[in-house]
Regions:
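Beta1/beta-strand and adjacent pyrophosphate-binding region of the FAD-binding site
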Residues: 3-18, 36
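Conserved Rossmann-like nucleotide-cofactor binding loop
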Residues: 18, 22, 43, 173
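Glycine-rich FAD pyrophosphate-binding loop
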Residues: 27-48
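N-terminal FAD cofactor-binding segment of flavoenzymes
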Residues: 45-89
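Short beta-strand to alpha-helix junction loop
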Residues: 101-122, 260-263
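Predominantly flavin-linked oxidoreductase catalytic cores and closely associated redox partners
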Residues: 123-280
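FAD/FMN-dependent oxidoreductases across multiple families
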Residues: 234-236, 242, 258-375
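C-terminal helical "tail/cap" subdomain of flavin- and related membrane-associated enzymes
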Residues: 343-515
């Protein structure tokens, strides 16, 4: 076998979004850098991470400059919506709904990741990056800046790449973190997922549904079908995301402590079986058919990486850790890490000092804070519409007052600063983590009392819209706080129901006891 040698400034393992974005930012910062991208696949396949947030949309449009591409080749996202029911027999138009009254006031997109990744990689190559594809990294040696070595197999031939810096953008494969023992599971958040793409999904905004459920259709002027719709239940939630061309992504995420998905022979069939037990899913997915071969399952979704940068290497995107798909934070982390690592590597290649210890400390604090604030034990209350209404208002308002306001204030530089950086960020983290703990405590009381999900029908919370303007988001934040404090007061009178174990309510909130509580 002939061995070919290549020397470069930066070698990036993985050419999907995080790797390609990092490469593109490096070339924009210093066009003279020799950047090599190593991608194992011949063509990208579809992956999750299809829904953007206001933060990742800012990165896509104002940092990468993809506004025109996204407008022509992807879908505009119209916020998120959550649907709840007291039982599977609930009427479709009586399910509790949380969402927007109007279309989104800030940019957001529903993206086919295969085509988005392909486009960003093409931009990186056009900017002067060298692409080696398909090629598999079979071995690496991290010798510090200037002396790290990658061994590849490309087309049956062996190649060696000597790089000043290596960037791991290999996603969940997390090549460096796994090899070095830096990857850790997070048993405190045992969430798993099943997902697939479907055809034949009903149009949320169709004339047929409008005629069948006129009051439901008239309740909002927003386009429900372009939102990320969530079916919510105790210990689980389902995303329903439309994609360009008509396919629809549907995924089930669940906490294995609280919920067990249906058994079955196929992932898509199991997802449909579960969704059709929810009144909304039964209507919207009545004629849905799974796209063969386009279905996946992951256990232990959540993991952390204890060191994400060292002398001569760094991790970006999912190679640096992953928390949870709820609220679509994946591309946010990709955006912050791509910009931060590109800044650090460009500085190092220019002979500037990079504070690696500080970077690892700030990233670890951001990652842990994001988990504690938003996700720790959230699946205990995700199936209760009243609790989630307060959580949604506070979560999204603080998100807009914090990260969204941060990046829109100066997109060119603020993606280099992690959320929760600084004194104000730390204070905000303590507050958000506190109210999350209190909502969990309220949910546990309701579970024990048999009243969990009692208000999951016959009302809706329709929000005028979120922006990063303090007045608007502040008003919604205080609305969420009022709801939270009122639930705290009501929970003082809740008493555990001795005849029914708490687990029964969590596993099946639609039993007779819960239904009786819901009708009082």
């Amino acid at each position: 076998m002939r061995v070919m040698h290549l020397t470069c400034d930066v070698a990036i393992i993985g050419g999907a979004f995080s790797g390609a974005a990092t490469a593109l930012l490096l070339k924009r910062r210093n066009p003279a850098l020799h950047v090599v991208i190593i991608e194992k696949s011949e063509a990208f396949d579809r992956k999750v991470g299809e829904s953007t947030t206001e933060v990742s949309s800012c990165f896509l449009t104002r940092v990468l400059g993809l506004t025109n591409y996204l407008g022509h080749h992807q879908l505009a996202k119209q916020g998120l919506r959550m649907w709840f029911a007291r039982s599977e027999d609930e009427k479709f138009d009586e399910c509790a709904e949380l969402g927007a009254r109007f279309n989104s006031r800030m940019p957001g997109f529903q993206v086919d990741r295969a085509t988005l990744d392909k486009h960003v990689l093409a931009l990186a190559v056009a900017a002067g990056c060298e692409l080696i594809r398909p090629a598999k990294v079979v071995k690496f040696e991290l010798g510090g800046a200037g002396s790290s070595l990658l061994e590849l197999i490309e087309g049956g031939e062996s190649r060696q790449v000597l790089a000043r810096w290596i960037v791991d953008a290999s996603g969940r494969a997390a090549i460096i973190a796994r090899k070095r023992g830096y990857m850790q599971a997070m048993p405190e958040h045992p969430v798993n997922s099943l997902w697939a793409r479907f055809t034949g999904v009903a149009d949320w905004d169709s004339i047929a549904l409008r005629e069948k459920f006129p009051k439901w259709a008239a309740a909002t002027v927003a386009a429900r079908g372009w939102a990320t719709n969530h079916l919510c239940g105790p210990g689980w939630w389902v995303w329903i995301i439309p994609l360009k061309g008509g396919d629809v992504s549907v995924g089930l995420v669940y906490d294995e402590r609280l919920f067990t998905p249906p058994e079955g022979t196929g992932i898509g069939a199991r997802i449909l079986a579960h969704c059709r037990e929810h009144p909304i899913g039964r209507e919207i997915l009545a004629d849905a058919k799974v796209i063969e071969g386009d279905e996946r399952a992951f256990s232990q979704l959540t993991y952390r990486v204890t060191q994400v940068m060292c002398d001569g290497w760094a991790c970006v995107g999912d190679a640096a850790g992953f928390i949870d798909p709820l609220y679509s934070p994946g591309l946010d982390f990709c955006s912050f890490t791509a910009q931060s690592v590109a800044n650090a590597v460009a500085d190092a290649c220019a002979g500037k000092c990079v504070d690696i210890r500080d970077y690892n400390r700030r990233f670890a604090f951001c990652f842990q804070s994001w988990f504690d604030c938003i996700y720790r034990d959230k699946y205990f209350y995700i199936g209760d519409a009243e609790i989630m209404a307060a959580a949604l208002l506070m979560d999204v308002a603080t998100y807009h007052l914090g990260p969204v306001k941060q990046v829109y204030s100066d997109p060119a530089t603020m993606f280099g600063a992690f959320p929760f950086d600084g004194f104000a960020g730390r204070v905000a983290a303590k507050f958000i983590a506190f109210y999350n703990r209190r909502l969990v405590a309220i949910a546990r009381k309701r579970i024990a009392a048999g009243t969990y999900g009692a208000r999951n029908a016959k009302w809706r919370l329709l929000i005028p819209g979120f922006t990063h303007e303090p007045k608007q988001s502040g008003r919604l934040l205080f609305s969420g706080i009022r709801r939270w404090l009122w639930m705290e007061i009501k929970s003082l009178w809740l008493r555990k129901k001795p005849s029914q174990p708490a687990e029964a309510v969590v596993k099946n909130p639609a039993d007779a006891e819960t239904e009786r509580a819901a009708t009082k």
